[in-house]
From Swiss-Prot:
Primary location class: cytoplasm
Protein name: Phosphate acyltransferase
Keyword Membrane: no
Enzymatic class: transferase
Record note on quaternary structure: Homodimer. Probably interacts with PlsY.
One GO process term, biological-process aspect: phospholipid biosynthetic process
Pfam families reported for this sequence: FA_synthesis
NCBIfam families tied to this protein: plsX
Keywords, in A-Z order: Cytoplasm, Lipid biosynthesis, Lipid metabolism, Phospholipid biosynthesis, Phospholipid metabolism, Transferase
Organism of origin: Geobacter metallireducens (strain ATCC 53774 / DSM 7210 / GS-15)
Family recorded in the similarity comment: Belongs to the PlsX family.
GO terms for cellular component: cytoplasm
Length: 345
């Protein structure tokens, strides 16, 4: 079991990726291969005590930047760190990939090198959000900004299977994100998707609104990558702003500071619950392999947790189980009501 880390991807690469890998290897004994400019990686590793750690270096001469086209990872920069990481996975030299780089490029490289699971047209980035009652899975949160109804239907099926067999939800409630609960709301994309999902035999509860993501009434929320990414970034910004507002209010008076001392544990638990770094990264569902996509601004904690999650994902055989379930259940779902034909028509 070995995790390949795209050490050159992300806003703070390679220092954060290297340190995150070192922490994961030291605390959890996870074998890791850092992919990127080996000279720079050796310099970064020299800042840490790596004695006894199973950390390998694999050279990649190119980097796909955050502003590069996603296709660069496939066509122009064939020796990019993210593509090379997926090549290691394909050849068996690694069992999972972790990247905080360009999410579009990561998805493109994963699709090109590993191919898609049977029955999936487009993979989706799935993100877990904390809620009042547990957790909600939202997909897609950035992989596909332009979608057709068939893609959202596939996202719904992947999310439902993931929630059941990974998150442990016995009967996941699936909702389609819209601007209101009434069937008349939404746009052409959501209305067509809504009519199709009503004919599929899982617990589809119809349209849900943005607030429903956090109140715990739904387990899987489906949307296109444009909307999902806005939701993701808005949530991160709101959590950060609320934290700063609370800090400012606490500083206003002695009584506020005293109250904080008695409530410190509650504040700490709240901060931990809304901290994206606790979740590490988001699994890329729909490709024939395990890949975790991290926030571009990921810190050491986030990279470490993404590596740990990827390791656990592989160790439990989650992707194999997901592939098996998708192959049988996707075929069954898609045959109900001639879903694919109705969309194509």
């Amino acid at each position: 079991m070995r995790v390949a880390v795209d050490a050159m991807g992300g806003d703070n690469a390679p220092s954060v990726e290297v340190e995150g890998a070192v922490v994961a290897a030291r605390e959890f004994g996870i074998p890791i291969t850092l992919v990127g400019d080996t000279e720079r990686l050796r310099q970064e590793l020299g800042k840490h005590n790596v004695q006894g750690l199973d950390i390998l270096l694999h050279h990649a001469s190119e980097v796909v930047g955050m502003h590069d086209a996603a296709s660069d990872a496939v066509r122009r920069k064939k020796d990019s760190s993210v593509r090379v990481a997926f090549e290691l996975l394909k050849t068996g030299a690694a069992d999972a990939v972790v990247s905080a780089g360009n999410s579009g490029a990561t998805m493109a490289a994963g699709m090109f090198v590993l191919k898609r699971l049977k029955g999936i047209d487009r993979p989706a980035i799935a993100q877990i959000f904390p809620t009042l009652r547990g957790k909600t899975l939202v997909l897609d949160v950035g992989g596909n900004v332009d979608c057709k109804p068939i893609h959202l239907v596939q996202f719904a099926i992947m999310g439902e299977v993931y929630a059941r067999h990974v998150m442990g939800v016995e009967q996941p409630r699936v909702g389609l994100l819209s601007n209101g609960e009434e069937d008349s709301k939404g746009n052409e994309l959501t209305r067509e998707t809504n009519s199709i999902l009503k004919n599929i035999s899982f617990d589809y509860i119809g349209y849900v609104e943005g607030r429903d993501i956090f109140n715990g009434v739904v387990d899987v929320v489906v949307c296109d990558g444009f909307v999902g990414n806005v939701v993701l970034k808005l949530s991160e910004g709101l959590a950060e702003a609320v934290g700063k507002m609370l800090k400012d209010e606490i500083k206003q008076s002695f009584l506020s500071k005293l109250g904080y001392l008695f409530s410190r544990k509650a504040f700490s638990n709240f901060k931990k619950k809304v901290d994206y770094a606790e979740y590490g990264g988001a699994p890329l569902l729909g490709i024939n392999g395990v890949a975790m996509i991290c926030h571009g601004g990921s810190n050491v904690k986030a990279i470490k947790n993404a590596i740990v999650f990827a390791n656990d994902y592989v160790r439990k055989g989650v992707n194999q189980r997901l592939a098996e379930k998708l192959e049988t259940e996707f075929t069954m779902y898609m045959q109900q009501g001639n879903v694919r034909e109705s969309v194509a028509g």
